Amino acid sequence: MTDCSRCAGTTTSGPNHWSERIRDIADFPKQGIVFKDITPLLSDGPDFASALDEMAQPWRTTPLDAVLGIEARGFILGAALARELRTGFVPVRKPGKLPGRTLIQEYALEYGTDRIEMHEDALPRGARVLIVDDVLATGGTLRAALGLAAQLELEVVGAAVLVELQVLQGRQKWANDVPLLATLSY
């Protein structure tokens, strides 16, 4: 969980109408946090399509073998983006959710640690992937997905998020040699 109380009321960098569908939910999931809720955007077909089109645009000419989508909202965006980009989709899940053999990557939270995993045979070594999540906050989950990709010796061509919460400075902790694109910033 990240404290985004400082994100409330900020303006967006996105000029598109669809950005108005992302709403602030105060004190969720706990007191003092303002949650950026993308579900109203997801429920509107034309606006969701516009957001996906904008998210896909920078990657349309990039050769890809798959999109790695991070649980849970990264699944929604990642699978839709994979279809848009005509490539495969690989889920990156919380522990114990994937059958078979998996690779695990631990990452730091504000208080403690968590883990994500993916199938160890998800893609062949050297496959070109795009990592996708809904929100870049502190960057821990994205960096963990980058770690999983490194374990599989995948080539990460970039990362894409729908929303970046700039005040939480997740971008400053990101790998400089891997492009990280946010469709919308607060």
Swiss-Prot record:
Recorded family membership: Belongs to the purine/pyrimidine phosphoribosyltransferase family.
Keywords assigned: Cytoplasm, Glycosyltransferase, Purine salvage, Transferase
Cell location: Cytoplasm
Species this protein is from: Xanthomonas euvesicatoria pv. vesicatoria (strain 85-10) (Xanthomonas campestris pv. vesicatoria)
Top EC group: transferase
Lineage: Bacteria, Pseudomonadati, Pseudomonadota, Gammaproteobacteria, Lysobacterales
NCBIfam families: apt, PRK02304.1-3, PRK02304.1-5
PROSITE patterns: PUR_PYR_PR_TRANSFER
Protein name: Adenine phosphoribosyltransferase
Major site of localization recorded for this protein: cytoplasm
Annotated pathway: Purine metabolism; AMP biosynthesis via salvage pathway; AMP from adenine: step 1/1
Protein purpose: Catalyzes a salvage reaction resulting in the formation of AMP, that is energically less costly than de novo synthesis.
Assembly and binders: Homodimer.
Any one GO molecular-function label of the UniProt entry: AMP binding
Entry GO terms, CC: cytoplasm
The enzyme's E.C. designation: 2.4.2.7
